[in-house]
Regions:
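A short alpha-helix-loop-beta-strand transition element characteristic
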Residues: 109-114, 126-142
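Conserved small/polar residues in nucleotide/adenosyl-binding loops
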Residues: 181-186
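Glycine-rich active-site loop/strand segments that organize a redox cofactor
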Residues: 84-117
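Extreme N-terminal leader/targeting segments of oxidoreductases
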Residues: 1-37
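Short beta-strand to alpha-helix junction loop
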Residues: 115-120, 158-173
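Glycine-rich FAD pyrophosphate-binding loop
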Residues: 57-76
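N-terminal Rossmann-like FAD-binding beta1-loop-alpha1 element of flavoenzymes
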Residues: 38-63
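Terminal amphipathic helices with adjacent charged low-complexity linkers/tails
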Residues: 138-161, 165
Length: 188
């Protein structure tokens, strides 16, 4: 008999699932954060970003690389860019439009609650990447440049000149190394 994976997506309307879930979650006392060790397996874009974010929140992070070098992550192959609903060009972009385009682009096979949550936090992800030093392409006025990509209704793809994946990994690694040096200095 095959086992079914339980994705544990919260109940309720799609637009409110994760908001309601976060509102009813138990919080970790700030004093207890240093007592918790969080194990992150993988140093690709997801693993490195998760480790950097959790480290910035004050958790002890144990990050394991399953390859011979962290820089061998396949995330380095991503070139197109990242979609976010920032509405820079005043073209009516919204979280719902990004959600719809993403679900449609995935042939309606994606978990809608997770895609909606990703659309909600897409602006924060771009802002975090900029704070980590990712050199996104910019317009002459200094605003982040974006383009239409992959059949989207509006221009919402933020990119780093054909090496978006590599630059995102370098940004995440630089955040990790800052945390590493800070914790090493605190241990001395």
């Amino acid at each position: 008999m095959a086992k079914t994976l339980n994705s544990r997506i919260p109940e309720g309307p799609v637009a409110e699932k994760w908001t309601n879930y976060k509102a009813h979650q138990r919080l970790v006392n700030p004093k207890n954060k240093l007592k918790l060790d969080v194990i992150v397996v993988g140093t690709g874009l997801a693993g490195a970003s998760a480790a950097a974010s959790l480290g910035e929140m004050g958790f002890n992070i144990l990050n394991f690389c399953i390859q011979d070098s962290p820089r061998r992550a396949h995330s380095i192959a991503a070139q197109g860019g990242i979609n976010a609903a920032k509405n820079y060009q005043n073209d009516g972009d919204s979280v719902y439009r990004l959600f719809y385009d993403t679900v449609k682009g995935g042939d309606y096979r994606a978990r809608e609650a997770n895609v909606y949550r990703l659309a909600e936090v897409s602006n924060d992800i771009i802002d975090q990447c900029v704070a980590q030093g990712v050199p996104f392409a910019r317009e002459y006025g200094g605003m982040l440049a974006n383009r239409s990509f992959g059949g989207a209704q509006v221009s919402r793809t933020f990119y780093a000149k054909g090496q978006t994946g590599q630059q995102l990994l370098l940004g995440a690694y630089s955040s990790l190394s800052c945390l590493l040096y800070t914790s090493d200095a605190a241990d001395d």
